[in-house]
Amino acid sequence: MQSFRRRFSGTIVTAITLGAPTLVDTITALQQRDVARAKAAFEAYDSGWNGIEVYVNTRSKDVYRFLELEFQPRITKALEKPNLDISEVLTDVQAMLVKFDEAVSTFANATPLNPLYDDVARLRIVRAHLREVTPALKAGNLAKARKSFEAFEDGWFNIEDFVRAQSLDAYVAVETGMVQIEQALLMSDQPDVAAVTGLVGGVMNQYNAVVTEVQKEARSAQ
């Protein structure tokens, strides 16, 4: 399954379109009555959604409401039920995919937003991987934690120059923290969960400060 946060060389709308496969995977898993796989696929959608939700909300509050406040919580809750009604949740995910595709089509033909919103989306898309690390560690899923951090490192190369231009201090702190996380998480057979979690939190704080500032600039310029 291709992640829609992994790499993006075109427009943000192009990056957003790659979110659809996670919903398609959820549908396929439900059709095959594979609930565990459906949960994993929808979790992947949810993680990626964090990267694009500000962009979507700015584009259309109605679309945001449907996806974020109606479909997403309803499907998430349904997937957690011990006696899952597969046909019911399948209908919801299929309807969500239709709404998602309609939104992408609308955004593609709309007047471009302030370019700063593209920057916000790029920053958040990359950050989505880092957000996955701590929950994976706490769940004891070391493989996922490592994979998510490696994906964050991969995406970082696409935006590190932008971050550096925004804040040299934040850039240096993120770079330093990433080296420390790599040593503690990737190079250790038995990582210290508390230590790695602390390091991830430190990088996240620095990264979030840049995201927050760029979001403020985007809203002021809109």
Predicted regions and their residues:
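Mature extracytoplasmic or organellar-lumen-exposed domains after removal of signal/transit peptides
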Residues: 1-222
